[in-house]
Amino acid sequence: MLKKLLILSLCSFIAAPVLADDITLDANDGVEYHQKEQKLIAKGDAVAKKKDLSIKADTLIGYYSPKSKNKISRIEAHGKVEMTTPETSTFGDKMIYDVKEDTAILNGTPAKIKSPEFSITSKGPITYYQSQQKAVANEGVEAVDNKGNHVYADLMTAWFIKDKNNQLVLDKIDIEQNVKIVSKDATVTALKGTYNAISGKIYLYDNVIINQNGNILKGSRAETDLKTSISKILSDGQKGRVSGVFKEKKKKKE
């Protein structure tokens, strides 16, 4: 029989109330209270919920705050971790959620974050700052949009805003360190850039190189439209010049 044990149901075993900051725990195999370590362990398809945040895992461990024995200050998630918010879903192997800071650090092989616009994977951690409405992915990051365009970098920061319906949606992604964009028609590299979710364009800066079917353009600024797969070098208003190498098409033999 499925056992759903909310934290509130443990009050008979604990001197102080354990439901704090509107956090609840569900688990198929039960919830254990370890008084000495001041922690709760939920096992078997465990779920922690707080307002519009949900964390699922094989095992969840809730730690009480040293200063306030009736408040959970940190949650650890182990095994098949999934965190869901109104704007994203994240997946990994382990997560640490700081309740006070409203921050979650996810690790996986790889860690993954999905929004309606993009799917982002990272060899390193993904840190989600819910109160700041942003997610940061480090090390070997790859983003893929709905049209199959690939964006690579060592650091990506996704920012979210509320739309006219008061729903959180992706606003932009800041892309830094070893940036590369691969579309069906071109490969573009740069030091940094910013993806605008509304326009579907990525604006690239510093040491930009566009390779389109063997034709190469170089400059300090560029624009890649992920909707049309068109990339172009932009003037930076300085004295720097745009250079290009164009591949001559081979004539067909008669």
Task: List the model feature ranges, each with a label.
Residues M1-E254:
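Mature-chain termini and adjacent capping regions
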